[in-house]
A protein has these predicted regions:
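Short beta->alpha connector loops at strand-helix junctions that form conserved
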Residues: 42, 91-92, 153
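Histidine/lysine/aspartate-rich catalytic loop segments that bind and position anionic ligands
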Residues: 129-153
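Short, small-residue-enriched loops and turns at beta-alpha junctions
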Residues: 12-15, 43-49, 96-98, 104-106, ...
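N-terminal small/glycine-rich loop or linker at the start of catalytic domains
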Residues: 1-16, 94, 98-101, 115, ...
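A structural motif corresponding to the C-terminal end of an alpha-helix
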Residues: 33-37, 116-128
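Conserved N-terminal beta1-alpha1 strand-loop-helix module at the mouth
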Residues: 1-85, 144
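Active-site beta->alpha loop and helix N-cap motifs at the rims of alpha/beta catalytic domains
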Residues: 70-108
Length: 153
């Protein structure tokens, strides 16, 4: 069994306090010492918790593979291409939600943007997943669209 840790809420707490406490790089060190297998980081469009500097600092200092959760937008595709994480998970985002409230509706995503993301993820050997509701229809859609894996809501 493998263990992945989502580090986003360390940043949420840090941001609420208005200082660098808790420190993300110290949290990363704890994760590395615990020998976790994957570090999940969700860079939201509104930068609510993790910001760009956090993302690149974590990548630079991490011995753990990064799983980048992101919306399927041009901006996020550019950032992912620059970051070159081991994994990318496409997630839905609504500005007014506190946390992700459901899976991605794969019937409504931009096929043009997905094609662009699939092309560079295959070229760079990045495993691509979709965060979907646990329905046979969505799981089959993910497979048919070319995703490597699914994450279930």
């Amino acid at each position: 069994m493998k263990l992945g840790i989502n580090i986003d809420h360390i940043a949420t707490l840090r941001n609420a306090r208005g200082q660098n406490n808790p420190n993300l790089l110290r949290a990363l060190k704890v994760c590395q010492d615990a020998k976790i297998d994957t570090l999940t980081v969700h860079l939201r469009e509104d930068r609510r918790h993790i910001n760009d500097k956090d993302l690149f600092d974590l990548k630079k200092n991490s011995k753990i593979p990064i799983n980048l959760e992101m919306a399927l937008t041009e901006e996020m595709i550019k950032i992912a291409n620059k970051l070159n994480p081991k994994f990318i998970c496409i997630v839905p985002e609504k500005r007014n939600e506190i946390t992700t409230e459901g899976g991605l509706n794969l019937n409504k995503i931009s096929k043009v943007k997905l094609k662009k993301l699939l092309k560079f993820s295959k070229k760079k050997n990045i495993q691509l997943s979709a965060f979907v509701n646990p329905t046979k229809r969505m799981i089959n859609s993910a497979k048919n669209l070319g995703f490597d894996t699914v994450e279930l809501h």
